[in-house]
C-alpha cells in the first residue's frame, strides 16, 4: 500500500486568502492527504475545520495525520457536491472559509491498484469512492463508440477522440480491456506517430476523460460551487484549485455570475432585473504556482487558484 502523502499546492497562497486566524468554521471539501487541512489547523486558534472526502483511505490517513488537533478537526466521508447537507447534519449552516482542491490526489495516482495511472499495470478502476458502481472497466468495455468519442473529446479535449474510441472498440471485440497498461498501449497506437512524440504521454487526455466520467467530476460542479457559495457567511472566502481548463472554466463562470449577476441588456441605461452581486472576486487573474513550487512539486504545473469573498 502506497503511503498517503500530500504536498499541498500553493499552501501559502491558500492560507493568505482563507485567513483561518480569523477563527470560525472552515471546510476542506477535498481532504485528500490532509496537507491543506494541516496548514489551516495550525493557524486556526479558535474554531473548527471539517474535512470532506469520498475516498475512505483518504479519510483514514488524514484523520491519523490530524489527530494532534483533537476536536478542532472532524472528517466526514462524502462528496463535496453534498456539502450543504453533510454540514447540516453537523448543525452547521454557515462557514468562514471553504477550500476545494479539485482532481485526483497524488496518492490515488501513485497507488497502482486504484487504476488511475497509465504508468503502472493495474485493473481498470479509477473510482475515487470504492462504494460507487461505475468503474473505468465499465466505461471502456461498455460504452458505445459514440459515447466514448464524446467523453474523450469533451472531458479529455483529445483531438483524436474518434480514432481512440475506434481503437478501443476494435480491441475489446477481441477480448475485454482489463488493465491500465493495455488501455494505454491501445490509446498510444491510435494517435499518429508524429503526435505521440510531442508533449506529455499520449494516454493522458483519455485517462483524464475516463476518470472524469467515472467520478462525475464535472456533472454537477457548477451546482456544487453555488452550494458552497451559499454556505459562506458574509466576509467568508472560498478558494478553488483547478487542474484543467474544463474545471477552470466552470469555476470562472460561476464566480463571475456571483460578482456580476445582472441579466439586463448591456445597452440598458439602468439595471431593472434587481439582481445584486453576492460575492467579490479576489483573484482577477488566477494564481499559479511559482518557479520554486514547480521544482519541488511538478504535479502543480497545471493548477490555478481562484477565490471569492462573500458580500
Across the structure, where does each feature detected by a protein language model lie?
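S-adenosyl-L-methionine-dependent methyltransferase catalytic core, i.e., the SAM/SAH-binding region
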Residues: 1-311
